[in-house]
Amino acid sequence: MTLIVTGAAGFIGSNLVKALNERGEDGIIAVDNLTRADKFKNLVDCEIDDYLDKTEFVERFARGDFGKVRAIFHEGACSDTMETDGRYMMDNNFRYSRAVLDACLAQGVQFLYASSAATYGGSTRFVEEREVEAPLNVYGYSKFLFDQVIRRVLPTAKSQIAGFRYFNVYGPRESHKARMASVAFHNFNQFRAEGKVKLFGEYNGYAAGEQTRDFVSVEDLVKVNLHFFDHPEKSGIFNLGSGRAQPFNDIASTVVNALRALDGEPALSLAELVQRGLIEYIPFPDALRGKYQCFTQADLTKLRAAGYDAPFLTVQEGVDRYVRWLSGQV
């Protein structure tokens, strides 16, 4: 049976297509918008049955043109948290997602989709409950509003609906994301260009470089998506992070030490990296004061209760792998 991946040429979508191929699945319809043509590179080493533009796809899917579809991995969205065109964001992330959802419900197709930790906004609790959700930008609101639709239809849905609130994702195939690419990606490129990584200094009670995020490898995102694909009886909205809050210092030191290892140089402690000028702290920008999250950490209680019990990569494990992959692409 046919599988469909929207956002297939993007960061997470292309990693899903590749993982499905590795499981022997090649009857995949890839859906995307290649206005940014450079994204095609993410699909060069993948096997797909067909490619469709996102607009053509949703119309044809609603008509039932693709016969029996087993599942849709809906990863397509505008993920730029700096986007200020609210009409575009809502059309792309909310209205379009509703159209795909409606067609899945009508045809009994498994629907696995990307939500976001941006639904929590400035909250200090990250649990899948309405009272802690307070998005701070229109991107977060578009994801939040769609999650509310899901909550209303879940009690009567006769096919799987599984949404995943992605936290700070890093890993292969993200280079097209430019400013929205991961901290690890930018640290890698900055170190190669300047010989050092720059991090924010002290802010809001956090020491220099000690502001934390839940950083999660795209490898783990793919594994969770495939776990739920294999368990169509499991539905709901789930946090998808590592469950750990790790500081930006961990990302930077792992990137630098991984690159040093590739050059045959020994690993250095954080203090040594700072002393040698390989990590540098800069004043916290005034423009970000009052708008910056110093802490995120996914509560994985609900995900674990749904049966996903595999461990998640630490920053040290996942970023080291990623740096080695990036170095092989240069």
Swiss-Prot record:
Which positions bind NADP(+)? 11-12, 32-33, 39, 54, 75-79, 92, 143, 169, 177
Q: Which domain of life is it from?
A: Bacteria
Residues the entry annotates as binding substrate:
N168, R179, H186, F200, G201, E202, Y203, R213, Y292
Q: What are the GO BP annotations of this UniProt entry?
A: ADP-L-glycero-beta-D-manno-heptose biosynthetic process; carbohydrate metabolic process
Q: Which cofactor does it need?
A: NADP(+)
Record's signal peptide? none
| Reactions accelerated catalytically | ADP-D-glycero-beta-D-manno-heptose = ADP-L-glycero-beta-D-manno-heptose
Give the Gene Ontology MF terms in alphabetical order.
ADP-glyceromanno-heptose 6-epimerase activity; NADP binding
Q: What class of enzyme is it?
A: isomerase
Query: Pathway membership of this protein?
Result: Nucleotide-sugar biosynthesis; ADP-L-glycero-beta-D-manno-heptose biosynthesis; ADP-L-glycero-beta-D-manno-heptose from D-glycero-beta-D-manno-heptose 7-phosphate: step 4/4
Q: What does the record's cofactor remark say about binding?
A: Binds 1 NADP(+) per subunit.
- Keyword terms, alphabetized: Carbohydrate metabolism, Isomerase, NADP
Task: List each coiled-coil range.
Answer: none
Catalytic residues of the enzyme = Y139 (proton acceptor), K177 (proton acceptor)
* InterPro entries in UniProt: Epimerase_deHydtase (IPR001509), Heptose_epim (IPR011912), NAD(P)-bd_dom_sf (IPR036291)
Q: What is its EC number?
A: 5.1.3.20
What family does the database annotate?
Answer: Belongs to the NAD(P)-dependent epimerase/dehydratase family. HldD subfamily.
User: What is stated about domains?
Assistant: Contains a large N-terminal NADP-binding domain, and a smaller C-terminal substrate-binding domain.
Give the quaternary structure: Homopentamer.
Q: Which HAMAP family match?
A: Heptose_epimerase
Function comment: Catalyzes the interconversion between ADP-D-glycero-beta-D-manno-heptose and ADP-L-glycero-beta-D-manno-heptose via an epimerization at carbon 6 of the heptose.
**Name of the protein in its database record:** ADP-L-glycero-D-manno-heptose-6-epimerase
Q: Specify the species.
A: Paraburkholderia phymatum (strain DSM 17167 / CIP 108236 / LMG 21445 / STM815) (Burkholderia phymatum)
